[in-house]
């Protein structure tokens, strides 16, 4: 009788399933969905239900499924520690609602760009780089547009202009008459 009960144990264990919606069950469900997507080439479209990933507009097989394209800022700054000028791409969502910390490529220092979650107490209520620099009397220049380009010459000296409306002499013909 004991042998009969023990021989049925694997069958009984396979039939036992958890009824909770805990993390393990969700993890298993996600793994099974990803496996099914890879095998069948299907993706879940929230608005339209199941659809083939190749029929999604503008998406190819190499495109990441379920990836949300977010708007970004292009941050260009000069490190005050080492003087390195660098550019970083930061999320607009993180800048306005989260925390943004960038690392200087020159000196490897970390610079706080935005702290909307009050992680850093030394900022005294300032939430982003615009407020931090405004408190110091410095300004932030915003450039908008897709192809925006801003060039600033730091040690600019105005060029010498000739008197009146005359054209400057041709430097290639010096001393010739």
Curated annotation (Swiss-Prot):
Keyword annotations from UniProtKB, A to Z: Chaperone, Metal-binding, Mitochondrion, Transit peptide, Zinc, Zinc-finger
Gene Ontology BP term (one): chaperone-mediated protein complex assembly
PROSITE patterns linked to this entry: ZF_DNL
Signal peptide extent: none
Cystine residue pairs: none
Primary site of residence: mitochondrion
Region Disordered, annotated ranges: 155-177
Protein name, per record: DNL-type zinc finger protein
Organism: Mus musculus (Mouse)
Upper lineage: Eukaryota, Metazoa, Chordata, Craniata, Vertebrata
Gene that encodes it: Dnlz
